[in-house]
């Protein structure tokens, strides 16, 4: 009896063990099936019925080269008071000229002697003009002489001190009725005090009217950076009578634009301020020689001694105050230069390393 009981217990344990082994086999087989199904699914993704994948290749775009015609502008600090100096300052009955007392003046006749230009003269050796203005003026007269062989030109008016301007003003106003536009500016409000202006006459009759041979000068002066400052049809704007003998230097791109569009300096200054600010559209210009320029206006920060002005890097630029409310920047887009050499004639308020990049724009 006891032996039968032991045999029965062994049989039960054996059956239990076999059952557990069988269950484990089923579980393992199921797990293997799940893993295999997962692998099969990752390796077999059906094609979309909407795409013909025969010969289909994925195109990876090539890295783009930087546009060489794009200019990076940086913010550079300039003395706010510099808005009162430069080629484009507006000096008229409403806007006084503020002298820096260190104008770089040269004697016209001394420069003629140095450069052996004997086909025009000035009244005497005391007649001076800003040095940067002499060369374009002399070159214009030289080209005129080569065409017409006319050596009768004389510079009859150039830089004037305020004291001399006062003498002229007193002399002319004593004989004027006051009914017409003035021909002599109020002291302190004369372009002649800037050194950027000169008056032509001729040594035969001392009556230059820009006619005959001299018409060439009045017609072509813009190519050398000059304008006829007081045009015949702009008296209501300039408040001066027509003066065909009075030439004012503003630079080639600006003289070109004003001449092509028949506008005077007052109108040009207003146009740049209203339409061509740095934040908006810039004036794009090509001169008669094919040189390209980009021009824009930046308002001065009159609440501070320093105005931060966006200027280009890698290309030459000029900056001028307008003597009213800001700065005009002229970018010579064809003239590539190294960083730091964009405008060697301008001294910023602080070191150039303080500049900050602002944005990139494209040259058209």
Q: What does each model-found stretch correspond to?
A:
Residues 2-158, 162-364:
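Extracytoplasmic cell-surface/polysaccharide-interacting catalytic and binding patches
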